[in-house]
Amino acid sequence: MKSESVSGANVPPRARQRNDRDLSDCVRVLTEVHEHDGYPVNWPDLPGAWLTPPSLIASWVAELDGRIAGHIGLSRSGVEDAAPGLWSTRAGTSIDATAVVNRLFVAPWARGHGIGALLMARAVTEAQARGLHPVLDVVASDTAATALYERLGWQLLATVEQQWSPEQKVAVRCYAAAT
């Protein structure tokens, strides 16, 4: 997608694989997103480690005007993920046949340039190239994210309640990429 960048130049955003040098910029952008939108709901003690979980398959960043403007990850399913089990039951496949799209965020200053859709397309392409079906969980109150997923044709599998801590229950919408 070609659009006018924040500097006023017509420069398309681009997605590329994240590297170790990007991590501090990703944490900075995540901090901006958390302050602006409250994502993630619970700020991690170690945000760099949160962006690099042991289950991570791959991750990408989006750049706009030469700056990190967004991030997305693709992971193997974990016990905390509801969508893989819902999809595998519906499709009659193993949970291992899914990949979880996660850690998607776009800097507030970079929104409106198609970066979320660009990153989603990159993660979906990678999952499918690995023979995996992309799924995701999103906090039900994150209406901007759910609007993006539905606009991209993702299918709502269910809304479930997750117990994130003894005092915190959260409604989560579970999606699967269109087949």
Predicted regions and their residues:
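A short beta-loop-alpha structural element at the N-terminal edge
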Residues: 12-28
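Active-site rim helix/loop that mediates acceptor-substrate recognition in acyltransferases
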Residues: 35-64, 68, 73
